[in-house]
A protein has these predicted regions:
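Active-site-lining helix/loop region of Rossmann-like oxidoreductase modules
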Residues: 9, 131-249, 263, 267-270, ...
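Sparse recognition of residues in long alpha-helices and their boundaries
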Residues: 62, 87, 195, 245, ...
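N-terminal Rossmann-like NAD(P) cofactor-binding subdomain of oxidoreductases
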Residues: 1-152
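N-terminal charge/polar-biased segments
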Residues: 1-7, 26, 272-297
Length: 297
């Protein structure tokens, strides 16, 4: 079966996990892992798996533009602000896993629509917390107007690499923005905590939602919408599940979800990284299928 070539910028934890997820993909062929340190473990790992390792950053892609049609950005928000312009000039589709938010926010279970895929050139995967919590907010906002949504994402310190730590301010701003734009909340707040517990905890997310009008009066509809959304997310993130049963009282809905990683490269406790890479793969697959259909026409 024909495949669409893709490259990954960023040879750290997220880039490495993406590469492992893509090695046996049915529609995507990972052709290059791009970093800035020839001695990095990520680039050495790429070579072992037969993936071209590029150590001079995005310049390596500029020198070899035919390497990929789709490019995953797994570096930092600052880096993508620079790289996005180059990718646009090269005519590459970009899937951004940083909080840069150059392109529109995308959460596969909420707003990845087949008919819109042809028009997507640069999409932003929000943040790990956004991928885990926005579907919950959206499920409730589809039933009742959401006046306010507050999310607390708690992740293991051991799963937070340099990129995550450098982007914490951007994480809170980008996640809160996307809760409004994609989740449908009027107002929002996002908080992230790093938990140093050993053994490491799974990613846990608590979502507090205040509705306009009585949520309790529509409890059945809300619970049904939540169950359907969780099942949707599980179609590409199998380890996504309720941590506790949702609570609906008066105008408040409280939902707790946890994410166990798939263990492709990262440990299973790193569900925070796994959910965003899985969402990015799902998005790339949709883009690739669209490109392959165009070729057949």
């Amino acid at each position: 079966m024909a495949k669409v070539k893709c490259a990954i910028i960023g040879s750290g934890n997220i880039g490495s996990d993406l590469m492992m997820k893509l090695l046996d993909n049915e529609v995507l062929e990972v052709t290059a892992l791009i970093g800035i340190d020839a001695e990095s473990e990520g680039l050495k790992r790429a070579e072992k798996h037969g993936v071209k390792a590029i150590s001079n950053g995005i310049d390596g892609l500029v020198e070899n533009p035919d390497l990929a049609d789709i490019v995953y950005e797994a570096t930092s928000a600052k880096a993508h602000l620079h790289n996005s312009k180059i990718l646009k000039d090269l005519g590459k589709k970009a899937i951004d896993l940083t909080p840069a938010a150059v392109g529109p926010f995308l959460v596969p279970s909420v707003n990845l629509k087949e008919e819109e895929v042809p028009h997507l050139d640069n999409v932003n995967m929000v943040t790990c917390g956004g991928q885990a919590t926005i579907p919950i907010v959206k499920a409730v906002s589809d039933v009742l107007k959401v006046d306010y949504a507050e999310i607390v994402a708690s992740i293991s310190s051991m799963s937070a690499g340099p990129g995550t730590r450098q982007n914490i301010d951007e994480f809170t701003v980008t996640t809160a923005n996307a809760i409004r734009e994609v989740g449908g909340a009027e107002k929002s707040k996002a908080i992230i905590t790093l938990n140093p517990a050993d053994p490491p905890i799974l990613m846990r997310n608590t979502i507090h939602i205040q509705t306009s009008g009585s949520a309790e009066a529509k409890k059945g509809e809300i619970l049904e919408a939540l169950d359907a959304m969780v099942e949707n997310v599980q179609s590409y993130v199998p380890g996504y599940r309720y941590k506790a049963e949702p609570v609906v009282k008066d105008d408040i809905v409280t939902v707790s979800v946890e994410v166990e990683g798939n263990g492709d490269f990262l440990p299973k406790y790193a569900g925070n990284l796994d959910i965003i890479t899985a969402a990015a793969v799902k998005t790339g697959e949709m883009m690739a299928k669209n490109l392959l259909e165009k070729e057949r026409v």
